[in-house]
Structures are given as structure tokens and as C-alpha cells.
């Protein structure tokens, strides 16, 4: 909810480009209702504001589930990274850790970057970064058809 509120109310992003990554929480701010879905995969939904250049990449149901799913897809054993393989225990670790600095997560992300959902996530981020104001909705939809 913090990400959504910051994008909606921040003067710098209010009328410019904004991209947020959010979990698919049960209770979303009302601002989300102003967005339409461009495409979705098993865990990733791309949404665009009706009239503004605002995008959300919504992770369903949450980032920890996506990470565990990607690890399973590429055959990564979470214990090799000293991380839990059960969602409840893994979520506890992710809530207590600054994953940007944690070498376990750096190694894990490096090893799961070839998973289908991580590739999609990276492609969406890269495309939107390079096409902030000249995106093509069909090109964005095509990323989900791979």
C-alpha cells in the first residue's frame, strides 16, 4: 500500500512516469481500481493506469511465493543457500533480512534468474525503463505470450 500511495501522491510521479512493484494484497488502495490489466502470467500481472503513465507489476500472491516457485522450476535447493523451503518459514526470513545486502539472496537470485517468471519480470522492468513514454501495449502483451 505504501508503494501505491507514494506513486499516487508524489508530485514528481503524479503526472510523469511511475512504476511500482507490489504484492497482490487482499486489500488494495482504491487507486488500483483506476488500472487495467495489460497481461498476466502465473505470478506476475502488469497493470497500467487508465490515463496516466503509471504502471504496477503485481506479484501474485506475493514475492516470497514467486521466489520459491522460480527456485523449484530451475531445481534449486533452498537449503543450499541456508534458506527455508517452506513458505511460512521463508517468509519469516524475508521479513527479517535486508535482502539487498544478504549474500544468500544474491546467490539465490543469480541462480534462479533463468526461470520463466524471473525472465518475464526482468524483461518488463527493462522494457518500461527504456520506453517510459513511448511504450507499445501490444509489445508489452507479447511478453506474456512467450
Positions of the model-derived regions?
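Acidic, divalent-metal-binding catalytic cores of TOPRIM
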Residues: 1-146
Amino acid at each position: 500500500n505504501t508503494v501505491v500511495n507514494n506513486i499516487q501522491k508524489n508530485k514528481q510521479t503524479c503526472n510523469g512516469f511511475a512504476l511500482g512493484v507490489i504484492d497482490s494484497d487482499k486489500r488494495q488502495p482504491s487507486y488500483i481500481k483506476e488500472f487495467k490489466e495489460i497481461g498476466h502470467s502465473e505470478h506476475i500481472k502488469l497493470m497500467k493506469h487508465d490515463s496516466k503513465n503509471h504502471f504496477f507489476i503485481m506479484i501474485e500472491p506475493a514475492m516470497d511465493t514467486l521466489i520459491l516457485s522460480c527456485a523449484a522450476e530451475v531445481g534449486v535447493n533452498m537449503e543450499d543457500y541456508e534458506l527455508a523451503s517452506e513458505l511460512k518459514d521463508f517468509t519469516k526470513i524475508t521479513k527479517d533480512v535486508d535482502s539487498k545486502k544478504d549474500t544468500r539472496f544474491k546467490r539465490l537470485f543469480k541462480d534462479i534468474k533463468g526461470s520463466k517468471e524471473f525472465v518475464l519480470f526482468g524483461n518488463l522492468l527493462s522494457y518500461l525503463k527504456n520506453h517510459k513514454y513511448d511504450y507499445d501495449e501490444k509489445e508489452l502483451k507479447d511478453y506474456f505470450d512467450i
